[in-house]
Regions:
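Membrane-embedded alpha-helical segments of multi-pass transporters/permeases
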Residues: 17-25, 30, 42-45, 84, ...
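Alpha-helical transmembrane segments
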Residues: 59-67, 115-132
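A helix-boundary/kink motif common to multi-pass secondary transporters
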Residues: 68, 94-99
Length: 177
């Protein structure tokens, strides 16, 4: 059951990240105008944040059911501290993108804590497999996002340009995954 739920989390996370990456800027450009677009680097980091959050959602559910909250409490505390410290360091260098990078790093620390609890208590011996699957998922995510973005970049702008982009986002990630 765990591996099926983990796969579902990945499929949903990769779809959400790819959809944001391909649709966010064109939608905002059509709605608010090009002048109000965020930097593409911000959109990419935002997509990674969504991916990290959704990808380990089921792992988090398993971890919550297991209890043993004391085992990963320091990961949570570390996550908050790292987020705060990195935000102060990265914001002056990268503006709002820097603060979001700090959040992605913090979410990865929380993810690591959940991995530790679940694979110590529930899935003993499966950690290497989980890490290999996550590495493969990350490569596949890059291909999905990059491939979909390359196709969408050839689409016309404006409101009508969103229609073929939506079709690309609905098809390409699902075919590649």
């Amino acid at each position: 059951v765990f591996w099926g739920m983990d796969l579902f989390s990945y499929l949903f996370a990769s779809f959400v990240a790819t959809a944001y990456f391909c649709l966010f800027q064109p939608f905002m450009g059509a709605w608010m105008g090009e002048r109000w677009l965020l930097p593409l680097s911000f959109v990419l980091v935002f997509c990674l944040n969504e991916y990290v959050g959704w990808n380990h959602r089921m792992l988090g559910s398993y971890r919550a059911v297991l209890g043993h909250f004391e085992q990963d409490q320091w990961f949570m505390v570390s996550s908050a501290a790292v987020n705060l410290i990195l935000s102060f360091i990265l914001f002056p260098m990268f503006d709002i993108t820097g603060a979001l990078i700090a959040t992605v790093v913090a979410h990865c620390i929380m993810w690591a804590g959940r991995v530790v609890v679940v694979f110590r208590r529930y899935m003993a011996g499966g950690l290497a497999h989980y890490l290999a699957v996550q590495a493969l998922h990350l490569v596949t995510l890059a291909v999905c996002m990059g491939g979909s973005y390359a196709i969408c970049a050839r689409m016309p702008g404006g409101w009508l340009g969103l229609v073929p982009r939506v079709l690309v986002v609905l098809v390409v990630p699902n075919v590649l995954n």
